[in-house]
Swiss-Prot record:
GO terms for cellular component: extracellular region. Keywords: Amidation, Neuropeptide, Secreted. InterPro entries: Lem_TRP (IPR013206). This is Tachykinin-related peptide 5. The modification Arginine amide is found at R10.
Length: 10
């Protein structure tokens, strides 16, 4: 999973 703040960008 991506880092926090980049949840929309996988």
């Amino acid at each position: 999973a991506p880092a926090m703040g980049f949840q929309g960008v996988r």
